UniProtKB/Swiss-Prot annotation:
Keyword Phosphoprotein in record: no
Assigned EC number: 2.7.7.77
Required cofactor(s): Mg(2+)
Enzyme kind, highest EC tier: transferase
Binding site for Mg(2+): D100
UniProt comment concerning the protein's domains: The N-terminal domain determines nucleotide recognition and specific binding, while the C-terminal domain determines the specific binding to the target protein.
HAMAP family, per database record: MobA
Role this protein plays: Transfers a GMP moiety from GTP to Mo-molybdopterin (Mo-MPT) cofactor (Moco or molybdenum cofactor) to form Mo-molybdopterin guanine dinucleotide (Mo-MGD) cofactor.
Catalytic activity: Mo-molybdopterin + GTP + H(+) = Mo-molybdopterin guanine dinucleotide + diphosphate
Gene giving rise to this polypeptide: mobA
Protein name as catalogued: Probable molybdenum cofactor guanylyltransferase
InterPro entries from the UniProt entry: MobA-like_NTP_Trfase (IPR025877), Molybde_CF_guanTrfase (IPR013482), Nucleotide-diphossugar_trans (IPR029044)
Organism: Bacillus cereus (strain B4264)
SUPFAM superfamilies in UniProt: Nucleotide-diphospho-sugar transferases
Amino acid sequence: MSKYAGIVLAGGMSSRFGEPKALAIWKGTTFVEHIVKVMGNTLQDIVVISHTDIKERVEQFVQVPVIEDIPHYKGNGPLAGIVSGMEYIEADWYAIMPCDAPNVSHEWFTILLEQTNNEYDAVVPIINGRKQPLLAAYHNRVKEKIYALLQEEKRSMGQLLSQCNVKYVSGEDVQANADWFINVNTKEEYGQAQKDLSNE
């Protein structure tokens, strides 16, 4: 069993974006391929959780396994994606990453995983006062908590955190790099991110 593994969440319907965000172009490739490459600098075992409609297209861009949600929980949001990844790869800790935060640096995964220890169930950054539970790390033991929530038809990441012993990370190295955690949810945000990229 690996100590650490990565789960990339690329199964959302991207309704506000208008097309699958996982396949949006970024730095000459796609969001999902870019995220997998960045994560791959720190982690060897990575799985991508994809939606049925785009799974075959995602597989063309990444060299890691691409799976769908566990059938019984398909469509139940990020909790379903996380637990599906946990079932696919055995590890002590899982770094979670949505496919729509393309500014993330490989440094973040080093910082994140250095904070893990068995005293905690999760390590979650706080950026500008807001918890970021989808750019976080979760211990394997959280899997049973997720199953219990899904059985009760509860899908909120906040509900999961309320049941976990969480280490919140908000140090200077995180706050100084708040752009790592910016999500691209709309075409307008995508255009701004592309503009910022060209100005670097």
